[in-house]
Amino acid sequence: MTSTSGKPKMEKFGLQTDKSARVILFRNGDRYHVEGVHCLVHSSKFKTFDQLKLEFSKKVGLFTGNVQKVYSMDKKRIQDIKDFVDGHHYICCGAEPLNTEVIPKGIQDIFGKAEVSDQDDEPKPSKPFVSSVPPPPTPTPTSSSGTTTTSQPTLSASPSVSSAQSPKKPVVSAYKESAVHSIDKFSVQTEKAKVIMCFRNGDRYHSGERVTVHSTKFKTYDQLKEQLSKQVKLPTGPVRKLYLASSGKLVKTMEEIIDGEYYVCAGGETLNPLDFSPTLSEHVKQKKLQEQQQQASEQQKPQEQEIF
């Protein structure tokens, strides 16, 4: 008996056949958003498009409010959950229109173009099954008598001959190297975490935020700046610059961060050392005194050597 409905066979029994879509979201008008936010979209988890936009608001964190509109790379507005495609990139907007001039760095190469979906769902042709068991012997009738004899299958080569033709490979020990190198090979190399204090630029009443920096927690410098934006909460927007408070040097990579130091977080504005908080000003004074003492001690050493 054949079914007349147009649904797939699996949907008759109440099984979910829709695939989830993994999408990458970017903030509208944020040119420093590089990696994007990964999110999983499925119709069983989000019943309506409004529920999905609330989830986007929590993950993306727009500076203009909640996510109200979502656009694809070809500038088309998404109207339903079914419009999302697995592996594609999207821009989240609030009440403001789509900013086509300031484009996030992560999608500058593909913005304005239609993305090509991966054709990984096509069924691949299955390989024919080849049995490793030899076929059974076939009976061969004889002309002189009525009895039948079975022909034994002939082997291509005996085990002794095959072993003589293929020489044995030498066994290489995994512990042939030195003891020190073998210990380093199996040991887990871990870096020490760096604990720093971060302050708002131009806010003399900010007491600072304690941030732990580790390579396993933050893979890139942009991820660290996103975490600083959540903790420090600059009134001018996200954290785009990080300055060393004692010298005013701009930090360009995560490797330049020093454990136990004080840093100033800024947006697009420049560093304002006149509005440092009392805690930050005291730290800068102590650092300058330590540097002066080190310079004085280094100058005294050559003089003592000349005397002796």
Swiss-Prot record:
Domain named Doublecortin: residues: 21-104, 194-277
Subunit structure, interactors included: Interacts with lis1.
SUPFAM superfamilies assigned: Doublecortin (DC)
GO biological-process terms attached to the record: adenylate cyclase-activating G protein-coupled cAMP receptor signaling pathway; intracellular signal transduction
Protein function: Has a cytoskeleton-independent function in chemotactic signaling during development.
Keyword annotations of the record: Cytoplasm, Cytoskeleton, Repeat
Gene designation per UniProt: dcx
UniProt biased composition (Low complexity): 141-167, 291-300
Residue numbers spanned by region Disordered: 115-167, 282-308
Annotated compartments: Cytoplasm, Cytoskeleton
PROSITE patterns, sorted: DC
Organism: Dictyostelium discoideum
Protein name per Swiss-Prot or TrEMBL: Protein doublecortin
A Pfam family that the UniProt record links to this protein: DCX
Highest taxon in the source lineage: Eukaryota
Classification via InterPro entries: Doublecortin_dom, Doublecortin_dom_sf
GO cellular component terms, A-Z: cortical actin cytoskeleton; microtubule; microtubule organizing center
